[in-house]
């Protein structure tokens, strides 16, 4: 056992308070992969512990063990000093563990309140569901998050940010002592993040132990007390976060210095490839015009609700525009479905890859070749060798980390899942690729690799639209940036005009 992790640091607020939860010598082995290797950590009351690591480092596996999805091959878990077995998800909940996951696990056709209290709804004396109490408690939880979401509406009517708030409310509805937050701020605005952190501090004051997973260092340094760094399934470092420089954390994560997170390649920009004129949607955006040139990375920036993703989905044929004109390589085209877009050479990497970009139970190779079956079949019959060869080509190009291309894509880390989504669209040999939050939930080492790959694609002549909420990313990677606000395009900035202040002023209407 790594001795450094047998006595983790304690929060000054809790002094020598014993750990609520300990993991000792935990190993998790899958065919061909040791996902966790002799990991020992402890979570103390009133302390936020940041779990940091690249995708594939073992963070997701640890969370699945703590939530009863996996049972470790080696090691033990102790709650209040007593050995405990999380044989099921319910057993973990009963032990006081709850999780807010990176990808929200909610049900579109249920109401907000039903999602919040699914599995633990309040009951009447007759053991029927107490709908009035459930709706009232849901409203109280949402109000605590400073949200005015109606608990009686169906989840499908909510935005991505609102879905995350419902997921947080669901976790808070269970009286847990150990709260795991896995990328909880990924789709939240700055105000919503501030609200969440206020709640996290309240949980600390109540003596909860919080495990906080994020790739956003500014958020980690703002909210976390301690940290544990994972690399290749091992716990390689720990300490007080605010006393440890970010560069040192990064070196622990990747085993090297990451000098250039935004490796932008200077490209000779060509002529117009995609021209959008006065594109309008019934409710989400109106009169949006843009020109995307060959080899260009056109960034689109804006706050939540600006209409960026909705514009991207319309260009990909997910929704139909109310009016407007679309020209590709000088020829006017009509996009009424994703099939039309793919056929024309326009592809879209969605923000929520798990819900919209992948068939999680299917193997990696099938996910990567789904849009390209015409290339891997003859006379209506799939050629397995060609299918594998095509998948392998893009898996190698993207440095995909997986035991085999035959494993379900749902078993991969978030970063590797994103590589599968990008790879499947590159296999169609597109002219335009739209990337919606391409590094959402991706660690800093993988981020640099993805940015480098995006730059390489642009250098090869691919035209790229990149939607991002991260100012360093949008500024570091874009040749030009279109700013949207409340469905309108409110500014177009050349590369030499880009600054955080200018983009935020435009996005908030204070230009």
UniProtKB/Swiss-Prot annotation:
Gene3D superfamilies: P-loop containing nucleotide triphosphate hydrolases. ATP binds at residues 53-60. It catalyses: D-ribose(out) + ATP + H2O = D-ribose(in) + ADP + phosphate + H(+). CDD domains: ABC_Carb_Monos_I, ABC_Carb_Monos_II. One of its GO terms (molecular function) is ATP binding. Residues 21-257, 256-511 form the ABC transporter domain. Its main location: membrane. GO terms for cellular component: plasma membrane. Keywords: ATP-binding, Cell inner membrane, Cell membrane, Membrane, Nucleotide-binding, Plasmid, Repeat, Sugar transport, Translocase, Transport. Transmembrane segments: none annotated. It is a peripheral membrane protein. It is an enzyme of class 7 (translocase). PROSITE patterns: ABC_TRANSPORTER_1, ABC_TRANSPORTER_2, RBSA. It is found in: Cell inner membrane. Disulfide bonds: none annotated. Its EC number is 7.5.2.7. Part of the ABC transporter complex RbsABC involved in ribose import. Responsible for energy coupling to the transport system. Belongs to the ABC transporter superfamily. Ribose importer (TC 3.A.1.2.1) family. PANTHER family: CARBOHYDRATE TRANSPORT ATP-BINDING PROTEIN MG119-RELATED, D-ALLOSE IMPORT ATP-BINDING PROTEIN ALSA-RELATED. The complex is composed of an ATP-binding protein (RbsA), two transmembrane proteins (RbsC) and a solute-binding protein (RbsB). This is Ribose import ATP-binding protein RbsA 3.
């Amino acid at each position: 056992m790594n001795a450094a992790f047998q006595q983790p640091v304690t929060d000054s607020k809790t002094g020598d308070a014993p750990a609520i939860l300990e993991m000792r010598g935990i190993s998790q082995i899958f065919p061909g992969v040791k996902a966790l290797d002799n990991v020992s950590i402890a979570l103390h009351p009133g302390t936020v512990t940041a779990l940091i690591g690249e995708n594939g480092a073992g963070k997701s596996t640890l969370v699945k063990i703590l939530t009863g999805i996996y049972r470790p091959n080696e090691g033990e878990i102790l709650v209040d000093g007593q050995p405990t077995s999380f044989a099921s998800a319910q057993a973990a909940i009963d032990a006081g563990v709850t999780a807010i996951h990176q990808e929200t696990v909610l049900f579109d056709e249920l109401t907000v309140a039903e999602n919040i209290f699914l599995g633990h709804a309040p009951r009447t004396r007759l053991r029927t569901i107490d709908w009035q109490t459930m709706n009232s408690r849901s409203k109280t939880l949402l109000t605590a998050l400073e949200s005015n979401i109606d608990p009686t509406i169906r989840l499908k009517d909510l935005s991505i940010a609102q879905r995350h708030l419902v997921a947080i409310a669901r976790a808070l509805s269970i009286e847990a002592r150990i709260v795991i937050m896995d990328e909880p701020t990924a789709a939240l605005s700055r105000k919503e993040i501030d609200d969440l952190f206020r709640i996290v501090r309240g949980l600390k004051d109540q003596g909860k132990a919080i495990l906080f997973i994020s790739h956003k260092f500014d958020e980690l340094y703002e909210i976390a007390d301690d940290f544990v760094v994972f690399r290749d399934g091992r716990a390689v470092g720990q300490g007080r976060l605010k006393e440890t420089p970010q560069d040192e954390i990064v070196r622990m994560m990747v085993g090297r210095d990451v000098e250039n997170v935004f490796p932008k390649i200077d490209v000779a920009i060509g002529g117009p490839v995609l021209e959008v004129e006065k594109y309008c949607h019934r409710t989400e955006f109106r009169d949006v015009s843009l020109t995307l040139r060959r080899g260009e990375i056109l960034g689109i920036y804006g706050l939540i609700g600006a209409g960026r993703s909705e514009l991207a989905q319309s260009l990909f044929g997910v929704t139909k525009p109310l009016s407007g004109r679309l020209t590709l390589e000088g020829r006017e085209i009509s996009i009424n479905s994703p099939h039309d877009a793919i056929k024309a050479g326009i592809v879209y990497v969605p923000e929520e890859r798990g819900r919209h970009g992948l068939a999680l139970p299917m193997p990696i190779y099938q996910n990567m070749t789904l849009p390209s079956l015409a290339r891997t079949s003859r006379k209506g019959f799939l050629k397995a060798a060609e299918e594998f060869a095509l998948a392998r080509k893009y898996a190698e190009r993207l440095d995909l980390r997986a035991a085999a291309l035959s494993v379900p894509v749902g078993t991969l880390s978030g970063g590797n899942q994103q590589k599968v989504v990008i790879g499947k669209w590159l296999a169609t040999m597109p002219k335009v690729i739209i990337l919606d939050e391409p590094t959402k939930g991706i660690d800093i080492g993988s981020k640099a690799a993805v940015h480098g790959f995006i730059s390489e694609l642009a250098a090869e002549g691919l035209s790229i639209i990149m939607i991002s909420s991260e100012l360093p990313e949008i500024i570091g990677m874009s040749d030009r940036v279109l700013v949207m606000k409340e469905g309108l395009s409110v500014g177009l900035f050349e590369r030499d005009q880009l600054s955080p202040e200018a983009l935020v002023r435009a996005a908030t209407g204070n230009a």
